[in-house]
Amino acid sequence: VFGAGGGTSSYQEIEETDLIVMWGSNAREAHPIFFHHVLKGVHNGARMFAVDPRRSSTAAWADVWLGIDVGSDIALANAVGREIISQGLTNDEFIAAATEGFDVYAEVVDDYTLDRATEITGVPGDVIKQLAHEYATAETAQLCWTLGITEHHNATDNVLALINLSLLTGHIGRYGSGLVPVRGQNNVQGGGDMGALPNKLPGFQDVENPDLRGRFEAVWGAEIPAKAGRHISLMHESMDEGILRCLFVLGENPMQSEADSGEMRHRLEGLEFMVVQDIFLTATAELADVVLPAAGWGETDGTYTSSERRVQRVRKVIDPPGDARDDIEILCDLARAMGHDWETPTAEQAWDEMRALSPLHGGMSYARLEDMGGIQWPCPDEGSDGSLFLHGRLWERPVTTRRAPFHGVDHAPPIDELTEEFPTRLTTGRRLDSYNTGVQSGRYASPRRIAGSIDLSPEDGATLGVDEGDRVKVTSRRGSLEAPVRFDRSLRPGLVFMSIHFPDQTDVNALTLDAWDPKSGTAEFKATAVRVEAVS
């Protein structure tokens, strides 16, 4: 919608806004540092809404919790939009001057009455109405989301439905109001910024634009493919079809992090050749033909970029152990082994080459990053101090650049349908003390650790006739596993939760579905149909 893949606001604004909406985000556990900024906002008087199927530890801080049914976010967002329009709460001046496509959007959301939305989402109509009125009438508001929005087969449409609300109300492009997609893990933002995307060059520049491509080719001395590459789910399809036969995996554990892990194992084992470059011998590395030991955090120089677009320096403090080496050294050695005359640059030299090609980063020298304690892009030159928020251009009159488009999107239920055979909805996520597939965090003890359990509502536990700690069998259309029961009063009957952190004990991705969003390639980790049975 806006041209670059980053949040529009800064954490400072979260602390000073009037209203915070946490939608599909259990930031209290998954992004605890970010949530400190949210709590500062709450303590400074901000109202807070939480939209989440579970009454999570984040939702517990909210003034209002909307206990949405899994996979019904678009229906809820469209109903909020309809209520704002029907009650005359839209920012008409902003819509007329800075957006396009409003009439088509209004026609789409007109079908999402409060009654229909309640039927689809399970959220009472008066609560939907309250969210609509408070969001529309707040002087400033921040709309935040994470993987509860993006790990669905219609992830992109989910995001578009939320962006529509900011355009309706003018909560974009000005201090205190914006959109905050909190990234899934450390430096995901930085990876995207650097072009670790199949359709973008560094700085979110379109790889299919010949003029942009030509600038990079002139510096790199190589021809860049004119077509965008495959996102991860298309790569899976290419493995299935025998088109993709070799894989180079850097810092990823797809054997345990991808949906439908049984099928993923089949794909990886069917490759002709696989290289894994990582700091640990992951389950994926155990399947590799070659493992290249890489240096970790504290063993390399470079930068990280946070969800507020802030680029910060990281510094090497110790040498990597054993045969482990810096990623740059490994990649340059590989290039030389393949016949290319590559020098091995320092991290700063690699960064300077990138920022010379990316207008978002042009003014971010290492010296300035250190002196300023980090800089938020865009920072086009050394006369710029970066940008607290994005898209202030939408408040210029007249708007001389591209207007922000509305997108009319419709509700589509989860692919994995609930049936008599699979009557329970499983959703997955994170816990406070653990990290992703547990390769790093599983190596130390924690008094807060909740291992590979399945969380049930007490009501479902009573129906199954199980007590806390008893083992149950969880079966989906793809696989099954056993796990101990943990009762969680934040869950409603019919909804169960498992974390992603303990695949060696309870491989939750043996259950999940490899149905993916055609636009983003993200699999539907959040909505699996399962059957839960007591183990005798």
Where are these regions (language model features)?
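Glycine-rich, charged/polar anion/phosphate-binding loops
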Residues: 7, 128-130, 231-235, 407-413, ...
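Long, compositionally biased stretches
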Residues: 375-456, 463-511, 533-535
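Catalytic alpha/beta core of large soluble enzyme barrels
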Residues: 292-293, 508, 515-517
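Short, basic and Ser/Thr-rich N-terminal targeting/leader segments
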Residues: 173-175, 420-422, 526
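Short flexible/disordered coil segments
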Residues: 201-216, 414-421
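Cofactor-pocket helix-loop regions in the catalytic cores of large enzyme subunits
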Residues: 1-187, 193-194, 206-386, 394, ...
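Long, low-complexity intrinsically disordered regions
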Residues: 517-536
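Flexible, surface-exposed loop regions and adjacent strand-edge segments
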Residues: 197-199
